[in-house]
C-alpha cells in the first residue's frame, strides 16, 4: 500500500479545505501514520478523500496505484473495497444487532443482487464472530447496537473495519469521544489488530502522548497545508508549539501545552 499526493486541492464552495498538498505515505515501511493539527486544518477532509467520500478540486492522488484524480467509477469502487474507515461517532446502525453491524463491512465485496443479511456466507459469519471475540463482544453478538456503551460501539467499528479485509484502514479521531481509559483500550485493540495483520493505518489524533506512543510517522496539517511530514523523532516540541500556537507563544499557551505532554 502506498499513497502518493501531488499538488492536491480540495474546495467546498468558497472555502479551500486543502491546498498544495504533496505527500508520499507508507512507501518507507511506516505502518502507523498519525495526522495531527488544529481543528479545521484539513485532516478529516484528507481521510474522506482517500475513502472516496470527497472529490478533489485539483492535483493528483494515487492510492495503491488507483488514480483518484481521473474520477473513474471502477477506481472508486476498488478504493472502497480496499479501504475501511473507523469513525469518531461510531456510525453504527442502532436497530441492527452487533453481529449485523460487523457484517456491514462485507458489503463492498458483495454483488448487489445478493441482497443484504440473508446471503452472507458461512465464512463471513465465522469471521464476524471471531472478530467479535477478539474485541471482547462475542456475548453481545445478538444485542442491538444502540444498547452498547460508547467504548463498546467503537469496538464494533473496529471489527467492522477488519472484516472488510482492507489494504488500508483510515481512522478519523477514533478515541476523541471516549474517556481516557476507554481511549487507551481502543487504541491498543486497533493497533494490535493492524500490526498482527500487517495493515497500514492512517489515523487522526489530538492526544499527543498517544501519537508519541503509537505512530511511526507524523503528518501535521495547518490551514489546509502540510506543516510537517516526517518520522516521529524529527517532530520536536518546538514544532508542536509552532503548529498549535504559531511563532509567538504566550505564557498561558506554554503552560497549557506543557500540561498536555504530562497527560
UniProtKB/Swiss-Prot annotation:
The keyword NADP does not apply. The keyword DNA-binding does not apply. Residues 3-248 form the ABC transporter domain. Signal peptide: none annotated. CDD domains: ABC_PhnC_transporter (cd03256). SMART domains: AAA. Its EC number is 7.3.2.2. This is Phosphonates import ATP-binding protein PhnC 1. It comes from Synechococcus sp. (strain JA-2-3B'a(2-13)). The lineage of its organism: Bacteria, Bacillati, Cyanobacteriota, Cyanophyceae, Synechococcales.
Amino acid at each position: 500500500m502506498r499513497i502518493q499526493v501531488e499538488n492536491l486541492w480540495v474546495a467546498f464552495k468558497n472555502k479551500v479545505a486543502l491546498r498544495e498538498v504533496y505527500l508520499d505515505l507508507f512507501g518507507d515501511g511506516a505502518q502507523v501514520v498519525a495526522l495531527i493539527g488544529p481543528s479545521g486544518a484539513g485532516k478529516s477532509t484528507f481521510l474522506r478523500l482517500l475513502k472516496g467520500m470527497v472529490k478533489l478540486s485539483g492535483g493528483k492522488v494515487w492510492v495503491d496505484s488507483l488514480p483518484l484524480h481521473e474520477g473513474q467509477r471502477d477506481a472508486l469502487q476498488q478504493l472502497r473495497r480496499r479501504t475501511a474507515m473507523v469513525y469518531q461517532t461510531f456510525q453504527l446502525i442502532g436497530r441492527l444487532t452487533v453481529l449485523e453491524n460487523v457484517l456491514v463491512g462485507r458489503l463492498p465485496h458483495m454483488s448487489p443482487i445478493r441482497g443484504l443479511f440473508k446471503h452472507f456466507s458461512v465464512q463471513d459469519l465465522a469471521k464476524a464472530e471471531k472478530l467479535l471475540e477478539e474485541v471482547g463482544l462475542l456475548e453481545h453478538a445478538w444485542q442491538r447496537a444502540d444498547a452498547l456503551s460508547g467504548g463498546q460501539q467503537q469496538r464494533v467499528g473496529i471489527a467492522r473495519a477488519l472484516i472488510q479485509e482492507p489494504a488500508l484502514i483510515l481512522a478519523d479521531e477514533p478515541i476523541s469521544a471516549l474517556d481516557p481509559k476507554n481511549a487507551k483500550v481502543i487504541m491498543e485493540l486497533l493497533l494490535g489488530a493492524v500490526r498482527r495483520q500487517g495493515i497500514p493505518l492512517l489515523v487522526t489524533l489530538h492526544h499527543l502522548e498517544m501519537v508519541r506512543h503509537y505512530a511511526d510517522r507524523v503528518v501535521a496539517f495547518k490551514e489546509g497545508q502540510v506543516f510537517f511530514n516526517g518520522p516521529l523523532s524529527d517532530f520536536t516540541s518546538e514544532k508542536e508549539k509552532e503548529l498549535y500556537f504559531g511563532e509567538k507563544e504566550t505564557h498561558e499557551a506554554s503552560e497549557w501545552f506543557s500540561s498536555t505532554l504530562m497527560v
